[in-house]
A protein has these predicted regions:
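Conserved alpha-helical scaffold segments that buttress catalytic/binding sites
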Residues: 2-321
């Protein structure tokens, strides 16, 4: 039996990253390395701790930290997150870029700073997974991503359509209509899944919750593929897509939603699409159960989204130029 203990001091700070204890060590997403050298990043995790645009209860500003904390557990499985057959860290330079700052209370500063930071990453060739924060943070991320990849298909998991027509107002319920009007996303090549609140489609393809439950996972995925096709797409996941039994810690919960198992199956089914960006938003830990099930769900689903980005990236790199 070896007497080697990997936790004994060696004088090398890299030992601090070798923890196999999920309750200790660095608080980065999946224990990814952390830096801001944009030319040395393939897959970037970016937090946007913002919740000023909420219309119900705030608290999503604490979402990125809570999701990172819960992601430490999945990082312990060196072979990768089940059921994926590989570790992202073996095939990509995965980096937690940490959070985009802004002057407290200044929404315009948040929008500008997110566009600047995500723009730097995307222009350097990285694919970005963003952790919110309320759902408005998707708007500047989409803006920066579309500036490089062109108008995008949106694959939107949510209890709300976020397409209210409020004129020039931007909040966490209006930004996708604004993005469509700005030419950032293409409604007819986009699909919204899980809606269970009143909405006007504004040209988006919508699979309401009742229809999702009626047709099931397989047909829902088939419909998503028919709509999106080979178009470059962005996956946005509001945690209130889930039923509050699985995700109570969010600002605008709506009963009658899918389970975490159904959500993961849906994300796995997108593995062959050309996903260039993604987000996980609206985790508000102040309302979470003591077991932190919402943050755990968010961390796991965000990790699945990171796999979508990695797989699509590999296919683009392998394609003939």
């Amino acid at each position: 039996m070896s007497d080697h203990d990997p936790h004994r001091p060696t004088g090398d700070i890299s030992d601090a990253q070798a923890f196999d204890m999920p309750w200790a060590g660095q608080l980065s997403f999946g224990r990814a390395q952390t830096h801001r050298r944009v030319d040395e990043i393939d897959l970037a995790i970016v937090g946007v701790p913002y919740d000023i645009a909420t219309t119900n209860r705030p608290g999503a500003r604490s979402g990125p930290r809570a999701v990172r904390e819960q992601s430490s557990l999945s990082a312990e499985f060196s072979q990768g997150l089940w059921p994926w057959d590989h570790s992202l860290f073996d095939r990509h330079r995965v980096v937690d870029y940490f959070d985009v700052g802004y002057a407290p209370g200044d929404t315009q500063a948040m929008l500008t700073n997110v566009i600047d930071h995500v723009g730097l990453l995307v222009k350097a060739g990285a694919n970005v997974l963003t952790l919110g924060g309320d759902h408005l943070i998707a708007y500047p991320v989409l803006t920066a991503t579309a500036a490089v990849h062109g108008p995008l298909s949106l694959i939107h998991f949510d209890a709300h359509s976020d397409t209210w027509d409020a004129g020039a107002e931007l909040n966490h319920g209006t930004m996708f209509l604004r993005a469509a009007r700005d030419g950032i996303i293409v409604p007819e090549r986009s699909v919204q899944i899980g809606m269970r609140t009143p909405n006007v489609t504004h040209g988006f393809n919508v699979i309401h919750a009742d229809r999702f439950f009626a047709i099931g996972i397989e047909e829902t995925l088939a419909e998503i593929h028919r709509i999106v096709g080979d178009h470059r797409c962005y996956v946005t996941f509001d945690i209130d897509f889930l039923d509050p039994a699985y995700a109570p810690g969010t600002g605008t919960p709506v009963i009658g939603g899918p389970t975490t198992w159904q959500a993961r199956q849906l994300l796995w089914g997108l593995a062959d699409l050309d996903v260039v960006g993604a987000d996980l938003v609206e985790v508000a830990p102040a309302y979470d159960a003591v077991t932190q099930i919402t943050a755990l769900a968010g961390a796991t689903l965000a990790h699945d989204e990171l796999y979508l980005l990695g797989l699509a990236r590999e296919r683009r790199q392998a394609a003939p130029r």
